[in-house]
UniProtKB/Swiss-Prot annotation:
Function: Plays an important role in membrane trafficking through the secretory apparatus. Not involved in endocytic trafficking to lysosomes. Acts in concert with CCZ1, as a guanine exchange factor (GEF) for RAB7, promotes the exchange of GDP to GTP, converting it from an inactive GDP-bound form into an active GTP-bound form.
Any GO BP annotation: protein secretion
Recorded family membership: Belongs to the MON1/SAND family.
Keywords on record: Guanine-nucleotide releasing factor, Phosphoprotein
InterPro entries for the chain: FUZ/MON1/HPS1_longin_1, FUZ/MON1/HPS1_longin_2, FUZ/MON1/HPS1_longin_3, Mon1
Subunit structure: Interacts with CCZ1. Found in a complex with RMC1, CCZ1, MON1A and MON1B. The MON1A-CCZ1B complex interacts with RIMOC1. The MON1A-CCZ1B complex interacts with RAB7A and this interaction is enhanced in the presence of RIMOC1.
Region annotation (Disordered) ranges: 102-141, 158-185, 211-245
UniProt xrefs under Pfam families: Fuz_longin_1, Fuz_longin_2, Fuz_longin_3
Residue positions where Phosphoserine is found in the record: S128, S153, S188
Name of this chain's protein: Vacuolar fusion protein MON1 homolog A
Originating organism: Homo sapiens (Human)
Gene this chain is encoded by: MON1A
Signal peptide (residue range): none
A cellular-component GO term for this protein: Mon1-Ccz1 complex
Residues modified as Phosphothreonine: T158
Length: 652
């Protein structure tokens, strides 16, 4: 016993009282005749020890029950029940409710992206998400896992650019040892097939490597696409050349690709031959700084940005006077680099320049310029590249599940990805288990299909490299439109170049299942309205928005409507989104929320760990109305998420 008359802690444990009286326990008057015993907690229902006087009860061993002893120090006002430590007294609960109400009130008044503590993130799919929501709980998050490489943010997509800018020759996506000579022969054969498919002219890589083969090269007459060189036309005067030069300078963005030896490879505008001296200056800048063990990344002067990205053996340069940041311009240059890899593979590109450092790469890329041109045009008007995500065709969840299940059942042993798309929008995607597609690879596939109308003529079997998945070799893609008069394109990616007939049979079985289940009619109906109107949201002043779920790698946006009907206005709107995006993802000082006011529209950006939201609002709207509209928009996206996103992706 302690000097104060109470038992020690060991004695209390021996008596069965267990833990000491909680500091937050409430004393209740003991009812007459009420004894001790075990009963459930007054608040949570857990079985707890009652502490009260009562008769001694014998147990089979003859010892008194420890939980029925009446300790002598228990007063008349005794505890008749215990409470769990998690229970809070009424007074404290009221204080907590008041604090919660104040926090909620501040959340509605100020949108700073840091209102919810990081250790109190919501783990439920709430109807109206909060900035502190955990990733995977936001609207549009896949319930069965992600389809793409898990890139949480824009920075995750561009983090590899640092090594390239510093002169690192690392080939991202290349796995395993360098290809053997037999592998190079296989890659050469695949490239010859791809060249025939895209340009109509077969090229043999082995012949290209012969001495003197690159001297005095001219464009093959049968090549399709923009000529790599543009000789002066007859009758051209000096004034016409000056006008052409002035028109060339008026373009807001130029893209150049050249080899480390200074050989021109690609130019967005103009002739590569006419710009060879300019490209030589660019290579000299890069080489001069590298000799000092440094690297040039960008030059900012007179409203222009000059961005350099080096991916050995290539150097890519962008010159722009747009709202894009240097980081976003570098991302576009990386897309151009990956586009070149998708045609050649990283292994073949390295092999070529190991054999000939001054090789003219236009020999192999001749005729494919339209694919690169189309990619730059898509990046200028399609927000998919800005968001680093894919957009889904709005479709009823039951129909999408039927399409995905039909793709899953119509499979072959060599298939890696089965993709159904329509107008650069994703309808369904089924992948091999433990194999994930990168959004950049999906964008390159979209660009390949939209660049050529020949795929509508029948079933195509073409080599394709997915540089973010594996830059060392070719896959083989079966590309076909389900019906000539629709935009539904089926893309089946296989690892076996000899498996055409088996993959073609997968297409036949897929179409049979669609007709049997009636899904082809629903798909036709959905293609009549491939985009939804912003009026469906029900916010009067809302003109347009972009919403991305980071965990799923998908985003949604309505159709661009008035006043952005012209192509110039649409590019201007995307330019405003690019400006907000660059401020939100600034490497030195990123912003969580941005409210931009302009003469024609107001914009709001909100970037959290789970999602990104960009809104275009009427210039007559106020900041308070824009902030209050966010919750309504997020509730609408939550309500329509099964129609706008792929929530249950399937695997083989």
């Amino acid at each position: 016993m302690h000097p104060g008359g109470g038992p020690s802690r060991a004695e209390r444990l021996e008596l069965g009282l267990g833990r000491e009286r909680p500091a937050k326990a409430i004393f209740l008057h003991r009812r007459p005749g009420e004894g001790g015993g075990r009963e459930r907690c007054l608040r949570c229902g857990h079985v707890c020890v009652r502490r009260g006087p009562g008769p001694r009860e014998a147990v089979p061993s003859g010892r008194p029950r420890p939980d029925t002893l009446t300790p002598p120090w228990v007063r008349q006002r005794a505890v008749t029940g215990t409470f769990c430590a998690s229970w809070t007294p009424l007074r404290n609960r009221r204080a907590q409710r008041m604090a919660t109400d104040m926090q909620r009130k501040r959340s509605s008044e100020c949108l700073d992206g840091t209102l919810t503590p990081s250790d109190g993130q919501s783990m439920e799919r709430a109807e109206s998400p909060t900035p502190g929501m955990a990733q995977g709980m936001e609207p549009g998050a896949g319930q069965e896992g992600a389809m793409f490489v898990h890139a949480r943010s824009y920075e995750d997509l561009t983090e590899s650019e640092d090594g390239a800018a510093s002169g690192d020759s690392h080939k991202e996506g290349t796995r395993g040892p360098p290809p053997l000579p037999t592998d190079m022969r296989q890659i050469s054969q695949d490239f010859s097939e791809l060249s025939t498919q895209l340009t109509g002219v077969a090229r043999d890589l082995q012949e290209e490597m012969l001495p003197g083969s690159s001297e005095d090269w001219l464009e093959p007459p049968g090549a399709v696409g923009r000529p790599a060189t543009e000789p002066p036309r007859e009758g051209t005067t000096e004034g016409d050349e000056e006008d052409a030069t002035e028109a060339w300078r008026l373009h807001q963005k130029h893209v150049f690709v050249l080899s480390e030896a200074g050989k021109p490879v690609y130019s967005r505008y103009g002739s590569e031959e006419a710009l060879s001296s300019t490209m030589g200056v660019m290579v000299a800048l890069v080489s001069f700084l590298e000799a000092d063990k440094n690297a040039i990344r960008s030059i900012h002067a007179d409203g222009y940005k000059v961005v350099f990205v080096r991916r050995s053996p290539l150097v890519l340069v962008a010159v722009a006077r747009t709202r894009q940041s240097a980081q976003e311009l570098a991302q576009e240059l990386l897309y151009i680099y990956y586009q070149i890899l998708s045609l050649l593979t990283g292994a073949q590109l390295s092999h070529i320049f190991q054999q000939k450092q001054n090789y003219d790469l236009r020999r192999l890329l001749s005729g494919s310029e339209r694919i690169t041109d189309n990619l730059l045009q898509l990046m200028a008007r399609d927000p998919s590249f800005l968001m680093g995500a894919a957009r889904c065709l709005p479709l009823a969840a039951a129909v999408r599940d039927t399409v995905s299940a039909s793709l899953q059942q119509a499979r072959a042993r060599s298939l890696v990805f089965s993709i159904l798309l329509a107008r650069n929008q994703l309808v369904a995607l089924v992948r091999r288990k433990d194999q994930f597609l990168h959004p950049i690879d999906l964008h390159l596939l979209f660009n390949l299909i939209s660049s050529s109308s020949s795929f509508r003529e029948g079933e195509a079997w073409t080599p394709v490299c997915l540089p973010k998945f594996n830059a060392a070799g070719f896959f083989h893609a079966h590309i076909s439109y389900l019906e000539p008069d629709t935009d539904l394109c089926l893309l089946l990616v296989s690892t076996d170049r000899e498996d055409f007939f088996a993959v073609s049979d997968c297409r036949r079985r897929f179409q049979e299942r669609l007709r049997k289940r009636g899904a082809h009619l629903a798909l036709r109906e959905a293609l009549r309205t491939p985009y939804y109107s912003v009026a469906q949201v029900g916010i009067p002043d809302l003109r347009h928005f972009l919403y991305k779920s980071k965990s799923s790698g998908l985003f949604t946006s309505p159709e661009i409507e008035a006043p952005y009907t012209s192509e110039e206005e649409q590019e201007r709107l995307l330019g405003l989104y690019q400006y907000l995006h660059s401020r939100a993802h600034n490497a030195s000082r990123p912003l969580k929320t941005i409210y931009y006011t302009g003469p024609n529209e107001n914009l709001l950006a909100w970037v959290t760990g789970a999602f990104e939201l960009y809104m275009c609002y009427s210039p007559l709207g106020t900041k308070a109305s824009a902030v209050s509209a966010i919750h309504k928009l997020m509730r609408w996206i939550r309500k329509e998420e099964d129609r706008l996103f792929i929530l249950t992706p399937l695997t083989y």
